[in-house]
Amino acid sequence: AMALVDSEELSVDTEASAASLAHAGMEVDLGAVAKGFAAREAEAAIRDAGGTSAMLDLGGNVTVIGTKEDGSPWRVAVKDPRDTGSYLCVLALTDVTLSTSGGYERYFEEDGVRYHHIIDPETGYPADSGLLSVTVVSADHLLADALSTALFVAGPEEALDFWRSRDDF
């Protein structure tokens, strides 16, 4: 299966609005950005309809538009991956999206081993980066969604180095 994992084998023709993969059996999984895309489109529809205050919760991706009706920021809790009934912190947010990726909700167990859904493209197995979850806050929905997954796979040191090198999340 790893022979079929290579993003360089995806060809995109923007003029024709077409994409192709080099080998039979290859697939594109948009799971790392699908909710970000949906949130972006939903926010645009709300704003186009005149909406100025809303919270969209897409399960792991939360978008806040404006402030609450009383003018205060939206308060968004970040789940504790060790105890999903509680939270690590509560963030006061306005006009941003928050995306959390982790292996604590979508998984299966086989022979006493837990396998979560975030795959490391280098190994073909669930990412084992030492992180339990990553939360990214940004005005860019797709960026937040993609980075929460990518930084989860990357691990703590690489994720922190990347975060320190940027100013857009």
Label the model's feature ranges.
Residues 1-169:
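Mature catalytic core of soluble alpha/beta enzymes
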